[in-house]
Amino acid sequence: MRLSQMLFVTLRDDPADAEIPSHKLLLRAGYIRRIGSGIYAYLPLMWRVLQKVSQIVREEMNAAGAQECLLPQLQPSELWKESGRWDTYTKAEGIMFSLIDRREQQLGLGPTHEEVITAIARDMIRSYRQLPLHLYQLQTKFRDEIRPRFGLMRGREFIMKDGYSFHVDEDSLKKTYQDMYQAYSNMLRRAGLAFRPVEADSGAIGGSGSTEFMVLAEAGEDEVLYTDDGKYAANVEKAVSLPADAEPSQFTAFEKRETPGTETIEKVTQFLKASPTQIVKNVLYQTVYDNGVTVLVLVIIRGDQEVNEVKLQNELTKLAPNYGAKAIINLTVPSAENQQTWTAKSLPLGYIAPDIADEYIAANKQIHPKFVRFVDKTAVDLKNFITGANEAGYHVVGANWGEQFPLPEIVVDVRKARPGDRAIHDSTQILKSARGIEVGHIFQLGTKYSQALGATYTNEQGEEKPLVMGCYGVGVSRLAQSAVEQSYDKDGIIWPVAIAPYHAIVTIPNINDAQQVEIAERLYTELNQSGVETLLDDRNERAGVKFKDADLIGIPYRIVTGRAITNGKVEIVERATRQSQEIPIDEVITTLQQWIKAAIEQKN
């Protein structure tokens, strides 16, 4: 392709609304154009990158035995209501675009396709002989993001590969899950990315287990905790660890003490000259289920620890059937305004004890009359601890479970693991932190969707059983931008060779020099004919402008038909290393073929 004929406009300055380097560079280099909030056009260079990423994804999925299909973007609300996710996705998380057609039927623009694929399986799979079955698609998805940001990282529409597998049992599912683990690792390796698979929370998708594939980058939205021995890595939402041991309490007798102005852990530790590890902290939450029922939750945790709200939400979701509900709409620490909607009398905030009376909750049929009390494992073994006295300005010291306070029945792990904690698999290993961009996620769904939608098969004994499912997603457009986030410098993008829009760019320093033009034209034609995808910068611009643009767009190899042609050579500059070599013109094709092959094979 000739740059003189391409829709190609670069910017010298960073766009004002771009926050992270990859977003700035893709806009500046003319790869994408913002059309609206979270909505981008993929321009010719970007489309080539996306096609290359998609091809790698296709090859790995096909090699794993999956079959490509294409599912509808418009999805009837009835399917989502069958699975119980319509309210979750249109009210709670609020990420599904929904609309009403001329027949007054509700529809959703698909952010994901579990319901659709399960409905197809329900209609078409009858026997164990048809299993296992694995289908996938590459398609534009939609999410009504509250705050679209970071370009293609968190847009309102994006390209995604989503796959779904069906099985007779968990063993079959686990095999495909492992196949996908390997396939996803292959995809990212082939794309030239540094990545880390991590244990993850399944979120609204559900299921028994999941793994995220994180591209490591400082601008990543996710925190990953890992150990140096390579045996543990997890998203911070899912991570587990061993906290530091609690310090022994200096309070050996139970006593109520006046502690004015000590509503926070920091203030009470200073006032009592105690360690936060000696304190039982009581954190109040308010959760609203999808049937409108409000439940007040008291999380009892060691004073130096923080509540992991993802873990807490998972525990509360397990309790949803107790309140006639399926999912959580909202989980918050209630504001003073929210408290007024359910309190019968003023709460002693900052001084709450584990046994705060249920009488604080006003009588209301939409409000559960009792606190749900979770005690985190970090608080269970504390002795002679400090905690609130249920009276403003007072704490108690020297308290014990089973004496002054009953130990709540529900013992959970809802603490937030953090760097510096000891690893559970080996207490000599210390958790470290890195930032990552989630570009892939694989799930073991089990029978969540098949049971909800009645998708069954007949086994060898003639019994009807629910299909066991897995699902597997790769953000194609996000992966492409994450490659930029991981590899750039002050001058522009440094594309991995495998997904670069072109392998090489031939730059003519002086468009008025007939010899430069002639050699450039010949190399451009012969390189493309030999399989080296090549751009020709034949614009009537100064050489400095052309060199800057070549660096900005990040093409791996720049061929310059400058002074060296008088010696029968051209200059080739490698974008990643900036190393420059003069190569005989007749050897350019074989040299580049070898370099490109070596660069791609190194990642395979």
Curated annotation (Swiss-Prot):
One GO MF term attached to the UniProt entry: proline-tRNA ligase activity
Keyword Cytoplasm in record: yes
Domain of life: Bacteria
One BP annotation, GO: prolyl-tRNA aminoacylation
Transmembrane residue ranges: none
Pfam family, one: tRNA_edit
Record's keyword annotation contains Ligase: yes
CDD domains, sorted: ProRS-INS (cd04334), ProRS_anticodon_short (cd00861), ProRS_core_prok (cd00779)
Keyword field: Aminoacyl-tRNA synthetase, ATP-binding, Cytoplasm, Ligase, Nucleotide-binding, Protein biosynthesis
EC number(s) reported in the record: 6.1.1.15
Reaction(s) catalysed by this chain's protein: tRNA(Pro) + L-proline + ATP = L-prolyl-tRNA(Pro) + AMP + diphosphate
InterPro entries: aa-tRNA-synt_IIb, aa-tRNA-synth_II, aa-tRNA-synth_II/BPL/LPL, Anticodon-bd, Anticodon-bd_dom_sf, Pro-tRNA-ligase_IIa, Pro-tRNA-synth_IIa_bac-type, Pro-tRNA-Synthase_IIa_type1
GO cellular component term of the entry, any: cytosol
Subcellular location: Cytoplasm
Domain writeup: Consists of three domains: the N-terminal catalytic domain, the editing domain and the C-terminal anticodon-binding domain.
Description of how the protein assembles with itself and partners: Homodimer.
Family: Belongs to the class-II aminoacyl-tRNA synthetase family. ProS type 1 subfamily.
Annotated function: Catalyzes the attachment of proline to tRNA(Pro) in a two-step reaction: proline is first activated by ATP to form Pro-AMP and then transferred to the acceptor end of tRNA(Pro). As ProRS can inadvertently accommodate and process non-cognate amino acids such as alanine and cysteine, to avoid such errors it has two additional distinct editing activities against alanine. One activity is designated as 'pretransfer' editing and involves the tRNA(Pro)-independent hydrolysis of activated Ala-AMP.
Protein name: Proline--tRNA ligase
